Amino acid sequence: MHLQPREQEKLMIVVAADLARRRQARGLQLNYPEAVAIISYELMEGARDGRSVAELMSWGTTILNRDDVQEGIAEMIPEVQVEATFPDGTKLITVHTPIR
């Protein structure tokens, strides 16, 4: 299987998010890359499911909360941006202050 660089990046997000969810299920608080991976993955999947950019921007702030991440991580992530594939093409989703 030959994947384009963009497809490889998306696959890495999926793998990182899966690992992060497993750690979260064990009761561990998430670090920076784990938190970003989960939020990015959920946004990409929401786009694939047909949700709008506006809906995802709002929903993106509810995926994780401060209790889910290690101390100081929420402040390290002022925004998350991810290019996602929607039924009508690729669009950029920006979620400001995703961890509240």
From Swiss-Prot:
<dbReference type="GO" id="GO:0043419">
    <property type="term" value="P:urea catabolic process"/>
</dbReference>
<keyword id="KW-0963">Cytoplasm</keyword>
<dbReference type="Pfam" id="PF00547">
    <property type="entry name" value="Urease_gamma"/>
</dbReference>
<dbReference type="GO" id="GO:0005737">
    <property type="term" value="C:cytoplasm"/>
</dbReference>
<dbReference type="InterPro" id="IPR002026">
    <property type="entry name" value="Urease_gamma/gamma-beta_su"/>
</dbReference>
<comment type="similarity">
    <text>Belongs to the urease gamma subunit family.</text>
</comment>
<comment type="pathway">
    <text>Nitrogen metabolism; urea degradation; CO(2) and NH(3) from urea (urease route): step 1/1.</text>
</comment>
<protein>
    <recommendedName>
        <fullName>Urease subunit gamma</fullName>
        <ecNumber>3.5.1.5</ecNumber>
    </recommendedName>
</protein>
<dbReference type="InterPro" id="IPR050069">
    <property type="entry name" value="Urease_subunit"/>
</dbReference>
<keyword id="KW-0378">Hydrolase</keyword>
<dbReference type="InterPro" id="IPR036463">
    <property type="entry name" value="Urease_gamma_sf"/>
</dbReference>
<dbReference type="GO" id="GO:0009039">
    <property type="term" value="F:urease activity"/>
</dbReference>
<dbReference type="InterPro" id="IPR012010">
    <property type="entry name" value="Urease_gamma"/>
</dbReference>
<dbReference type="GO" id="GO:0016151">
    <property type="term" value="F:nickel cation binding"/>
</dbReference>
<comment type="subunit">
    <text>Heterotrimer of UreA (gamma), UreB (beta) and UreC (alpha) subunits. Three heterotrimers associate to form the active enzyme.</text>
</comment>
